[in-house]
Amino acid sequence: MHLLPELASHHAVSIPELLVSRDERQARQHAWLKRHPVPLVSFTVVAPGPIKDSEVTRRIFNHGVTALRALAAKQGWQIQEQAALVSASGPEGMLSIAAPARDLKLATIELEHNHPLGRLWDIDVLTPEGDILSRRDYSLPPRRCLLCEQSAAVCARGKTHQLTDLLNRMEALLNDVDACNVN
């Protein structure tokens, strides 16, 4: 289920392309849930800027896939099916996991908080009925910015930081994980 970094497109995505890609992902999720009546983990990489498919985002994605598989194994949860693809919005993974949706969401939140690359992952859990379990459902604060303690959404809207600073931070986190051989 890993993606080859050397095949990244480096295509700069427009806002309309990004919106279409998100709609297509939602349609894929609902079709997937019809085939697999268990919770669905839908996993993407948080990538600032217009280039969503790069060597860096694919490497971050691959670490996430490894971490999700390890989480399922540790918990004794069966992955019934899994798939990876690249859309206009970047690397995307889907895993049908036979586990209580609430437990799955809590475990993925912990993964996002505790893994060195967790801040760069967007892990959604959908119930078999198609409802997305949100961080707000667990009274958790919004995601934090990569560079400061503000809400990531506030910094993104206000364009508080230079794109190069955000991308450099992403790459530094990835290189640290690779150097320490963290999975």
Swiss-Prot record:
Source organism superkingdom: Bacteria
One GO term of the biological process aspect: prosthetic group biosynthetic process
Root EC class: transferase
The keyword Zinc-finger appears for this protein: no
Catalytic activity as recorded in UniProt: apo-[citrate lyase ACP] + 2'-(5''-triphospho-alpha-D-ribosyl)-3'-dephospho-CoA = holo-[citrate lyase ACP] + diphosphate
UniProt keyword terms in alphabetical order: Nucleotidyltransferase, Transferase
The keyword Nucleotidyltransferase appears for this protein: yes
MF terms (GO), sorted A to Z: holo-citrate lyase synthase activity
This enzyme's EC code(s): 2.7.7.61
Family indicated by similarity: Belongs to the CitX family.
Function field: Transfers 2-(5''-triphosphoribosyl)-3'-dephosphocoenzyme-A on a serine residue to the apo-acyl carrier protein (gamma chain) of the citrate lyase to yield holo-acyl carrier protein.
Name the UniProt record assigns to this protein: Apo-citrate lyase phosphoribosyl-dephospho-CoA transferase
Taxonomic source organism: Escherichia coli O7:K1 (strain IAI39 / ExPEC)
Gene (UniProt): citX
